[in-house]
C-alpha cells in the first residue's frame, strides 16, 4: 500500500538516502547519528527478536503492521514494525536543499483539497505541533483526496486505509538535540528546508495507480 520502497523481510537497517551530515545546519549529524543510528536501529533489532520463530518471521513489514494493529488493540510486534517502517519513510521524505513549495499535479491537488498551499502548510504544521506527546503528522491520500492526519506513537496511515505521502516525526528524539523544546521551530525548518517534494510526488503517483 505504501509508495516508498519497503523494508525487506530481512529487516535490514537501511541508511538514509543522504550522508548523515548532508542536512546540516537544519538537522545535525549528531541528531542523525542518534535518531537513525540508535533509535531506528533499536526498532529493527527488537523486531527481529520479536518475530523470530513466529508466523510473522520473514513477512514484509507492511504485512506485520497490518496483522498486529488488531483494530487498535495492538499486538506486541506492532510498535517496532511500524516504527521501523515510519523511520525509513521519514528519511526518504527529506533531501539536502529541500523544502519550499511543490509544483505540478501535487501542488494542484493541495490547492484543490486545502484551497491553497498556504492552508495546507498551516494545517500540516498545526497537526505536527498539536500531536500530544510522541507521534507523527502525515499528508495522506485516500478516496482520491489529500488529507492531513496525526497519529500517536507508532500508528501510521497504512492501518487507517490511507496511502502515506509525507511524514514528520514529532517524537522528542527527532528534534531535541537541535531544537530542545521548540517543536514548532523544528516543524518550520522541516517544511522550509528539508522536505523532498519529488519523493512526495512519486508516492502520489504510486498511490493513484494502486487505488485505480
From Swiss-Prot:
Modified residues (N-acetylalanine): 2
Subcellular location: Cell membrane; Plastid, Chloroplast membrane; Plastid, Chloroplast stroma
Gene3D superfamilies: Fe,Mn superoxide dismutase (SOD) domain, Iron/manganese superoxide dismutase, C-terminal domain
Record text on activity regulation: Activated by cpn20/cpn21.
Keyword Ion transport: no
Record key words, sorted: Acetylation, Cell membrane, Chloroplast, Iron, Membrane, Metal-binding, Oxidoreductase, Plastid, Transit peptide
Record-listed Fe cation binding positions: 35, 87, 169, 173
Origin: domain of life: Eukaryota
GO terms, biological process: circadian rhythm; response to cadmium ion; response to copper ion; response to light intensity; response to ozone
EC number of this enzyme: 1.15.1.1
Catalytic activity: 2 superoxide + 2 H(+) = H2O2 + O2
Cofactor field: Fe cation
SUPFAM superfamilies assigned to the protein according to its UniProt record, in alphabetical order: Fe,Mn superoxide dismutase (SOD), C-terminal domain, Fe,Mn superoxide dismutase (SOD), N-terminal domain
NAD recorded as keyword: no
GO cellular component: chloroplast; chloroplast envelope; chloroplast membrane; chloroplast stroma; cytoplasm; cytosol; mitochondrion; plasma membrane
Induction, per UniProt: Circadian-regulation. Down-regulated upon photosynthetically active radiation (PAR) (e.g. light fluence) increase and in response to ozone fumigation.
Cofactor note: Binds 1 Fe cation per subunit.
GO MF annotations, alphabetized: copper ion binding; protein domain specific binding; superoxide dismutase activity
Similarity comment text for this entry: Belongs to the iron/manganese superoxide dismutase family.
Purpose: Destroys superoxide anion radicals which are normally produced within the cells and which are toxic to biological systems.
Subunit structure: Homodimer. Interacts with cpn20/cpn21.
Protein's name in the database: Superoxide dismutase [Fe] 1, chloroplastic
